[in-house]
Amino acid sequence: MKIAVCGKGGCGKSTVTSLLAKALARRGKEILVIDSDESNYGLHRQLGMKLPRDFTDYFGGKQNVLNDMMLSKFTHQFFEETWTIDDIPEDYYSLKDGVKLMSSGKIHQANEGCSCAMGTVMTQFIQNLRLTEDQFALMDMEAGIEHFGRGIDNGVDLILIIIDPSYESLQLSKKIGELSESIRKPFYYVLNKVTKENQEMMYEAVWNSSRVAVSLSANSGIMREGLMGKELLEKPDAIENLT
């Protein structure tokens, strides 16, 4: 199953992605985590891994990818055949405890241009990726909804929307739900950073409460590990239930 993890910046996409990946791996599943956010420099730390090499380098680097796109009027196909998790070159992933991490690419310096190259490569990659019943691909998406405009979400099986206790997050989650329905993808909500004080308000304010999968309580251990850039070792019951 291919799952896109979406939401506003700071809502907890990387945290949920990391915790879910670890929980599924403990159940004996083979997990591929795809870092699809060129601005995210923390996901690999939460998984206890090194940041892997940019996957765009496999195709000659960001500039070569852009050149191929422009010369073909943006129709260039980077994948001639379907791929499996085992087909990912060893130089382009990190591996720990049954979880494999790859990265679409990062912005490394000022004025290097947009992230269109990474988006195009990942759109085609996820569409050409074939998984078995015991394999999961979790895509930690960039904040917001631009990835819907790029068509990346067309290649997934399920969309997981993370919501934190803020008006902006609730409003964006409604839009993501609508976009998910427009491309006929099932979606579920994860209420994150939930407390006794905000739980009822969040549940009542969410666009479609029947799509709430779990509520993840605010956790001081997770917050501390995240703040220090350490591997997330907590095992919240809500994440176990989500698996």
State each model region's role:
Residues 23-97:
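N-terminal phosphate/diphosphate-binding loop that engages ATP/GTP or pyrophosphate donors
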Residues 181-243:
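C-terminal lobe/tail of nucleotide-utilizing enzymes
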Residues 2-36:
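Walker A/P-loop phosphate-binding motif and the immediately C-terminal alpha-helix
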Residues 38-39, 107-109, 143-144, 166-167, ...:
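Conserved nucleotide-binding/hydrolysis micro-motifs of P-loop NTPases
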Residues 103, 160-164, 189-192:
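Conserved beta-strand segments of the P-loop GTPase G domain that flank and frequently precede/overlap
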Residues 124, 128-133, 147-167:
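Inter-motif core of Ras-like GTPase G domains
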Residues 21, 25, 153, 181:
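Gly/Ala-rich phosphate-binding loop of Rossmann-like dinucleotide-binding domains
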Residues 76-145:
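Phosphate-binding/switch loop-helix module in NTP-utilizing enzymes
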